[in-house]
C-alpha cells in the first residue's frame, strides 16, 4: 500500500448506511453497525456465492462416494458449511477493505466502506478478521483432516487475492479458485477422495467450472466500477474486456457447460443431471447475457442477478437428483 494515505472523502465520513436505518437491520446497536458493514451483512448475495460450491461438493461427494452419505449427515454438514461460509466471507471482506482502503476512497461505490471512511481502524479490522477465521475453522472442526488443509489453502488465497488487483487483470480467477476449493473440501467431507483416481478428472472439471462461474459473477458485478477503476488503476477482467463483455461471458458460459457435461459423462450421471445442471444452467446464463447485451439489465442489481441464481439452482438441482437416486434415505441410515 502507498506510504501516503488517500484522504477520506468528506461525504463518506458522515455516511449512514440506509439499510441499517430501517427494517430488520435497524435493531443492531449503532456501535456494531460498522463491523456488520465490514462483513457485508446487508449484502447476502456474497454468502450465496460462497456457499453454493459447498453444496455442489457435498452432493457430488455424497452421490459419487462408494460409502453413501446418509441424509442426516448431509444435512449436518450443510449446516456446518453455512457457518464456515459466513465467517470466512466476513474475514475476507474485512481483509479486502484493509488492503484496498486507498483504492476504495477513489471509487464512488466503495468510499463509504467502514475502513475507507474511517469508521473502523485498520487494526480493529484485522483483529475482527482474525476472529472470523477462528470461528470459521471451529465450524469445520468435526470434518476430516483434508478439510482443514483445504480450508487453510482457501485462507491463503483469500489473503493473496486483494493484492492481485494491483498486478494482473485476472484477479477474478484467484477469487474463483478461492471459492472453488470449497467444492473439493465438501467432497472430502462427504467421504469422497476427490483428487484421487478415478475422481481426479471429474473433480478438476467441476472445480474449474465453479471457478469460471465466480469469474462470470464478478465480471458482471464489477462492470459498475469500470470508470472509477480506470482512473484509479485497479485491474480486472471487467476493465480489460470492457468493450467485449458479452463475448467474454458467452465464452465462459460455453466452457462451463462443457465442463459440467464432461463430468456427467465421466461419472455416469443420469439424464436429469444433463437437463438441469447442463441445459438449465446454460439457458439461464445465456438469457442473462442477452439481457445485458440488449440493455434489459443495466446493473447487477436488476433482474440479471436472479438469472444467475437460477443458473446455480439448476446446477444444484441436477446434483440433488443424482443424490436422491443413489443415497439411502434417513430412515435407512
Swiss-Prot record:
Pfam families: UbiA (PF01040). It catalyses: orsellinate + (2E,6E)-farnesyl diphosphate = ilicicolinate B + diphosphate. It is found in: Membrane. It comes from the Eukaryota. It is an enzyme of class 2 (transferase). It is a multi-pass membrane protein. The chain crosses the membrane at residues 74-94, 125-145, 147-164, 173-193, 201-221, 247-267, 272-292, 304-324. One of its GO terms (biological process) is terpenoid biosynthetic process. InterPro entries: Prenyltransferase, UbiA_prenyltransferase, UbiA_sf. Keywords: Magnesium, Membrane, Transferase, Transmembrane, Transmembrane helix. Belongs to the UbiA prenyltransferase family. Prenyltransferase; part of the cluster that mediates the biosynthesis of LL-Z1272-beta, also known as ilicicolin B, a prenylated aryl-aldehyde produced by several fungi and that serves as a key pathway intermediate for many fungal meroterpenoids. The first step in the pathway is performed by the non-reducing polyketide synthase stbA that produces orsellinic acid by condensing acetyl-CoA with 3 malonyl-CoA units. The prenyltransferase stbC then prenylates orsenilic acid into grifolic acid. Finally, grifolic acid is reduced to ilicicolin B by the NRPS-like protein stbB. This is Prenyltransferase stbC. It comes from Stachybotrys bisbyi.
